[in-house]
């Protein structure tokens, strides 16, 4: 199936080694659609390694996702009566809640062009988030032994990735001005007793549209990407 290119920024030379397609849908996207698009582009990169990489920046309609091997014990509702769709997917980590007001980034990158090391990649995604928050005069923090980002001991961003022959999918989710009630239906990321936060709690009135260009630029800078048209 073709990738929905959505909104593209100014094209550059698609032969550039850091070229990447930027996909920014205007409306909230059903999870199944974005997952299919990621897998499609991942497969294309496996078959044609010279192609540009791709990054999706979007919001999801409300849903819950469970990583590989995630325990359903972290769901506080019966699976046959979920408050929103539930998807078991091919990423690491436990349960995550997606919804409007949360900015999601899905980089489909070939780590062989950088460093074929998933631990390195996870730390780089955390650094992207730290860089974004710094632009807002907020100091994001890592917690030892955990993946994601915290502000004042409240988790504001979740990270979970999948990888096939060093080509990534899935990514990160940053809570900006989303409702938090849906997180009470699960144990987010399997971390009992850890509070969830959103950036608007620190910066009243902050909108997702203000943060999206910061995340776009931080990803481009960290992974040396130049946005381009579809190959």
UniProtKB/Swiss-Prot annotation:
Its EC number is 2.3.1.181. Pfam families: LplA-B_cat. Residues 49-227 form the BPL/LPL catalytic domain. One of its GO terms (biological process) is protein modification process. Disulfide bonds: none annotated. InterPro entries: aa-tRNA-synth_II/BPL/LPL (IPR045864), BPL_LPL_catalytic (IPR004143), Octanoyltransferase (IPR000544), Octanoyltransferase_CS (IPR020605). The keyword Membrane does not apply. Keywords: Acyltransferase, Cytoplasm, Transferase. It comes from the Bacteria. One of its GO terms (cellular component) is cytoplasm. It catalyses: octanoyl-[ACP] + L-lysyl-[protein] = N(6)-octanoyl-L-lysyl-[protein] + holo-[ACP] + H(+). Substrate binds at residues 91-98, 158-160, 171-173. One of its GO terms (molecular function) is lipoyl(octanoyl) transferase activity. Pathway: Protein modification; protein lipoylation via endogenous pathway; protein N(6)-(lipoyl)lysine from octanoyl-[acyl-carrier-protein]: step 1/2. Its main location: cytoplasm. It is found in: Cytoplasm. The record marks 155 as: Lowers pKa of active site Cys. The active site is at residue 189. Belongs to the LipB family. In the reaction, the free carboxyl group of octanoic acid is attached via an amide linkage to the epsilon-amino group of a specific lysine residue of lipoyl domains of lipoate-dependent enzymes. HAMAP family: LipB (MF_00013). Catalyzes the transfer of endogenously produced octanoic acid from octanoyl-acyl-carrier-protein onto the lipoyl domains of lipoate-dependent enzymes. Lipoyl-ACP can also act as a substrate although octanoyl-ACP is likely to be the physiological substrate. This is Octanoyltransferase. The gene is lipB.
């Amino acid at each position: 199936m073709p990738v929905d290119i959505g909104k593209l920024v100014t094209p550059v030379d698609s032969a550039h080694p850091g070229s990447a397609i930027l996909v920014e849908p205007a409306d909230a996207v059903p999870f199944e659609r974005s997952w299919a698009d990621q897998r499609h582009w991942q497969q294309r990169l496996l078959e044609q390694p010279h192609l540009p990489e791709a990054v999706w920046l979007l919001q999801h309609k409300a849903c819950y996702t469970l990583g590989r091997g995630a325990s359903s014990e972290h769901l506080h509702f019966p699976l046959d009566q979920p408050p929103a769709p539930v998807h078991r997917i091919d990423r690491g980590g436990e349960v995550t809640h997606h919804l409007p007001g949360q900015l999601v980034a899905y980089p489909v990158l070939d780590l062989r062009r950088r460093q074929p090391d998933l631990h390195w990649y996870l730390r780089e995604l955390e650094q992207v988030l730290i860089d974004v928050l710094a632009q807002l005069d907020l100091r994001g923090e890592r917690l030892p032994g955990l993946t994601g980002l915290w502000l004042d001991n409240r988790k504001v961003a979740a990270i979970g990735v999948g990888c096939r022959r060093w080509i990534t999918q899935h990514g990160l989710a940053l809570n900006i001005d989303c409702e938090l009630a849906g997180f009470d239906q699960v144990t987010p990321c399997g971390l009992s007793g850890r509070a969830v936060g959103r950036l608007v709690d620190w910066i009243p009135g902050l909108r997702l549209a203000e943060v999206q260009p910061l995340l776009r630029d931080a990803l481009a800078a960290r992974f040396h990407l130049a946005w381009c048209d579809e190959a």
